[in-house]
């Protein structure tokens, strides 16, 4: 896989959230990973399931860090091609540098930082840590 597809922290976070929801909800939770080329987000977006499985369903799009909003905006746009019940967005770290008109419905933490800062999210067996540098 090319460098633009390697990081899958959003999928790891979504998997953890879907497992937790399975424990507390009687709803049928379907996990789906999505691959978006960050340098060319209009290029072939890949889903791990057929998009039609999401038809007339509620969709939650999960990412680890919301920076400019570009990735999340293109992820939401992808699901607008089918009829769905609702779309919500969830992020672990919400930064305030958005260039796109998108926001997270569910946020782990709001982080004010400069554009020069970088947030790295590390997934371990028992915990998830976010580092600002």
What do the predicted segments below correspond to?
Residues 7-13:
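Glycine-rich phosphate-binding loops at beta-strand->alpha-helix junctions
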Residues 15, 19-58, 70:
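Short, glycine/charge-rich flexible loops or terminal/linker lids adjacent to PRPP-binding catalytic cores
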Residues 6, 36, 92-94:
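Cofactor-binding loop segments of dinucleotide-utilizing enzymes, especially the Rossmann-like FAD-
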Residues 10, 49, 61-62:
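Structured catalytic core of nucleotide-sugar glycosyltransferases
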Residues 13-15, 71-72, 99-101:
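Short glycine-/acidic-enriched loop or helix-start segments at secondary-structure transitions
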Residues 77-133:
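PRPP-dependent phosphoribosyltransferase catalytic core
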Residues 1-5:
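Short, small-residue-biased leader/transition segments that mark boundaries at the very start
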Residues 57-86:
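Internal catalytic or translocation cores that form aromatic/hydrophobic pockets or channels
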């Amino acid at each position: 896989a090319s460098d633009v597809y390697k990081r899958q922290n959003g999928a790891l976070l979504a998997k953890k959230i879907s497992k937790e929801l399975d424990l507390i909800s009687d709803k049928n939770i379907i996990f789906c990973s999505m691959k978006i080329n960050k340098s060319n987000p209009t290029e072939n977006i890949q889903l791990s399931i057929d998009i039609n499985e999401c038809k007339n369903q509620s969709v939650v799009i999960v990412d680890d860090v919301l920076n400019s909003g570009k990735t999340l905006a293109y992820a939401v746009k992808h699901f607008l091609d089918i009829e769905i019940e609702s779309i919500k967005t969830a992020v672990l770290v919400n930064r305030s540098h958005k260039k796109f008109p998108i926001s997270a419905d569910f946020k782990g933490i709001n982080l004010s930082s400069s554009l020069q800062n970088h947030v790295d999210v590390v997934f371990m067996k028992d915990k998830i840590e976010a580092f600002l540098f």
